[in-house]
Amino acid sequence: MAGLRQIAFYGKGGIGKSTTSQNTLAAMAYYFGKKILIVGCDPKADSTRLILHEKAQSTIMQLAAEVGTVEDLELEDVCKPGAGPFNPEQPSPSGGWIKCAESGGPEPGVGCAGRGVITAINFLEEEGAYSDELDFVSYDVLGDVVCGGFAMPIREGKAQEIYIVMSGEMMAMYAANNISRGILKYASSGGVRLAGLICNARMTDREYDLANALATKLGTQMIHFVPRHNIVQHAELRRMTVVEYAETSTQAEEYKELARKIVHNDLKVIPTPMNMDDLESLLMEFGIAEQFDEENVGKKAEA
């Protein structure tokens, strides 16, 4: 496991984190021959569906509830090979492949979903899922709530490289700044580092410049700007990644370039998160937010 790189994708809910991570990891396997284990750490259990061509993978916590305890599970019950060119038995021309596991969590409103992340990762480690043949383990983590459970890949030093999926929208930037705070908190004890921002474009005003400025403020890089394209949704409807669905498309080239940058990335930093005033000032600088005035609170836009 000496050469194993453990990375994590964090980001605000609904930002396209799982879609971006799966398309990027698919490109890493397909074009660059990387052997990857994806560990989904989102209660939605949607971190592997495009790789598996399935609606949703059965989760470790779900299967454990069916058989009694996690100890009653076998690794092959919860760790599934990718479909098509991502299957280890029939790997891509480059030799890359992907295996998938989803941590899952309790029923909505009951218990701690973050606890499922901890239980799942411990089980995978104990059962030998982190084999020597792997190049990458990737965690796909819910990023709105950086609670103890969801921060586990950061807190326990499981993931050394964090990629934050964001956009030029205020709440996505707010979440990115919050996640950076979590990384900073555990940087000294766990060795975790921020490896870059991935801007999953929403086509807002001056989005590229704003994302780049946020990256600079956080002391990192905008590792790639992923343009918006309908082909991503078309591929999703077939439960496929873009590199498999439309290999010659310009969007496949975007994910290939992002994959290349991650494979060769050596810029991993302790972030410098901003306070809320500085974040709002950044938005004002780029014309996204107006100069704040208490007298305007609750007032409608002028006609």
From Swiss-Prot:
Cofactor binding: number and manner: Binds 1 [4Fe-4S] cluster per dimer.
Catalyzed chemical reaction(s): N2 + 8 reduced [2Fe-2S]-[ferredoxin] + 16 ATP + 16 H2O = H2 + 8 oxidized [2Fe-2S]-[ferredoxin] + 2 NH4(+) + 16 ADP + 16 phosphate + 6 H(+)
Enzyme's top EC category: oxidoreductase
Positions contributing to [4Fe-4S] cluster binding: C112, C147
GO molecular function: 4 iron, 4 sulfur cluster binding; ATP binding; metal ion binding; nitrogenase activity
PTM summary: The reversible ADP-ribosylation of Arg-115 inactivates the nitrogenase reductase and regulates nitrogenase activity.
Enzyme Commission number(s) of this protein: 1.18.6.1
Cofactor (UniProt): [4Fe-4S] cluster
Record-listed ATP binding positions: G11, K12, G13, G14, I15, G16, K17, S18
Swiss-Prot/TrEMBL keywords: 4Fe-4S, ADP-ribosylation, ATP-binding, Iron, Iron-sulfur, Metal-binding, Nitrogen fixation, Nucleotide-binding, Oxidoreductase
Known role: The key enzymatic reactions in nitrogen fixation are catalyzed by the nitrogenase complex, which has 2 components: the iron protein and the molybdenum-iron protein.
Family stated for the protein in its record: Belongs to the NifH/BchL/ChlL family.
Known partners and oligomeric status: Homodimer.
Protein name per UniProt: Nitrogenase iron protein
Source organism per UniProt: Wolinella succinogenes (strain ATCC 29543 / DSM 1740 / CCUG 13145 / JCM 31913 / LMG 7466 / NCTC 11488 / FDC 602W)
Gene that this polypeptide is encoded by: nifH
